[in-house]
Each structure stands twice: as structure tokens, then as C-alpha cells.
Amino acid sequence: MESLKKEVYEANMDLVRLNLVLFTWGNVSGIDRDQGLVVIKPSGVAYSDLSPIDLPVLDLETGAVVEGSYRPSSDTPTHLALYRAFPELGGITHTHSVYATSFAQAGRDLKAYGTTHADHFAGDIPCTRMMTPEEIGGEYEAETANVIIETFRERNLSPAEIAAVLVHSHGPFTWGKNAAKSVENAAVLETVAQMAFQCELLEAAVPLGGTRIQQELLEKHFFRKHGANAYYGQN
């Protein structure tokens, strides 16, 4: 568990290094599926004050804190529910990075405009529906996960191929095989959101934004890096 704590700590520090967060915003978690335990950033603690020992450890099924003296992130129920729903997830990141959050606040899917997007995501990044007053007034953080899960299931999307979502009026969640990969995907998401924003400014005369990348080009760039026949890199 100490190695997972260190991994999740370093991933949280990467949020600061990559300028994805301000103040105490954002959080990263990681999971040990063999033990059914999750490590996550504590709630409201400044990144500069964090050390690996400060990160609480929770039971995946019950949400009970099994190790640590700090309260876990207020977004913990969202993380836990996503881990339960999507067994391929090994780490989750939540930020309020500016451009990705702008699309979330506008209630807009992030359209795949080019190959930078396609290198990392196999399609548009979905934005969830608005949450109902009952969902907001109930178990809000768990219901946040529910609208994410609903979005992927209703649209028949693979969380392994599209490792990100925009929560309407809120912000982005990203994930990956581990905590570090979930942060990498958060950084990529923010970059392609900025590219998309600027692309739409340049094509402002086109209704609903610019021209989406050709599907064939999107699939070529995604699957040359991912999947059984990937040939990008040294592995």
C-alpha cells in the first residue's frame, strides 16, 4: 500500500506541475484491485502540505477509511462508484482546468477536430446531461458518478477508448490504467480542449463549431497507439 500511496501522491503533485489546478482544487486517486483498496487525496489540504503518509486509504465496497487520519476528498463517492462500474480503471483524476471546464459549463461535448485528440481519445469527449434537483439534493457525489456511467452506457462508449468525461456545469474527470496515466489524460484533455476552443473561434461562421476529423483518420491515429495492432513507440 505504501507504493500506491507514493504513486498517488506523485500524481497529485503532477496536477500542480502541469498547471491543472489552483489552491486545493482537484484530486487524484488510485486503486489496488487485488486488495479492494483506494488511495485518494485528502479533502481541502494544500498540495504543498501533502506527503504520501497523509493520503487516506478506503475500502472500495464500503467507502470506509481503513487507514489515515485525514478525511478523504469530497469527490470520493464519485471515484468509488466509477471504479465499481468500470473495472478497467486503475486511476482517476478530477480537475477544474480552464478549457475543459469551459466545455463542461457550456454543456458541450468536446468534438474530435484533429489528430492530437485522436492520438489519445477514440472519439468525442461526452458531456453528461444536467443533474436533476433531486440528484443534486441527494447523494450528490454518488449521483455525479451515476450520470457519468449513464452517459457511457446510453451512448455505448468504451471507457478504455474514451478515458474522459465532462460533467455538465462542473468539470472533467479522466482515468487510466493507473494514477499517473489518469493525470496524463487530464493534461491531454486540457490541451485538446484549448485547441478545440481556438479552432471554433477560427471557424466561428460554421454552426456548432468547426469540422470534425475524418473518422478514418481518427481511428488510424488512436489504434496505431492503442490496441492489439498498435505500432507506435518501442513496445
Features from the language model and the residues they span:
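Glycine-rich flexible loops
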Residues: 1-235
